[in-house]
Amino acid sequence: MTALFSPFTLRGVTLPNRIVVSPMCQYSAERGEATDWHMIHLGHLALSGAGLLCIEATAVEPDGRITHHDLGLWDDATEAALKPVLAAIRKHAPIRVAMQLSHAGRKASSQAPWEGGQLIAVADGGWLAHAPSAVPHKDGETPPLALDTAGLNRIRDAFAAAAKRAARLGIDAIEVHAAHGYLLHQFLSPLANRRTDEYGGSRENRMRFPLEIFETVRAAFPEDRPVGVRVSATDWVEGGWELEDTIAFAHELKRRGCDWIDVSSGGVSPLQKIPLSPGYQVPFAQAVKRAVGMPTIAVGLINEPAHANRLIDAGDADFVAMARAMLYDPRWPWHAAAELGAQVTAPPQYWRSQPRKHKALFGDIAFGQR
């Protein structure tokens, strides 16, 4: 069996292959509510043939949105808006669906990327962001408000409430977003966390709130459904969060029942210098997997099927997550299966698209006409 198309079980959820559609912000919600765009976007990705589809970073409270148009899950209206989207996916695709729960922290109140992505001032319709410390993301920006005890409690409760709503929606798995410079990553990184209480200073203290959030989500989500965490393995800035910190964090997550680590990098500082190349973040996933012994997801410029299969076969990671490559080619898993001689699930409406030279691509299928 081809490694990339071999099954893998996380808790009570078995995935048919190792391909994950990464969570990708769409900036297309209204008041946090999913729209027709989400029906189209998630619907066509659900037919991709991937093993797991992860819904974009979903804010647990309005102030935790990156932009005005981020998806949210904080009240009955945001929950209800996702129901028809998920119902359509379940009706037409066998894919498992995860959701990434997130809080933007000091990177909140931003423009959409195609509008420039900059901070929106309160006077221009934005809002004051909250963060571990009153340290802005960029020099010259309005500093965020440092979270006090009441704020920490509010956010902790918001993650728990969102996890319960996700469970009611039938979400198969949750990924807690602790990467890319958003709130939980801000707590982890000494570049953003300047607190002097039990949530700042030492690495142990900086890990405390993210670990509390994980425990809260794990307790609120059904025991038979997995919960993982996305991390930035390094800040790519001297004096920031590094791989050895990520490994220590992963050990603590494993002790608390974490089911996977999705290993990305960067995002907490505009000073980062990232050496981009195919698979440039795979060594981080490999290091975490070998040091901690828990399932890992590799991500970042893994665009070729042979490359993806090779790293799974070598044990460098257990899954590969794809974002931009999947947007460019929403049938990437089909094409990968064809190239590697594997099989992939396709809806019967699309069976006739199976190339003649790949007669077993969609498995044991048959159709006819008068």
Label the predicted regions.
Residues 1-370:
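Flavin-dependent oxidoreductase catalytic cores
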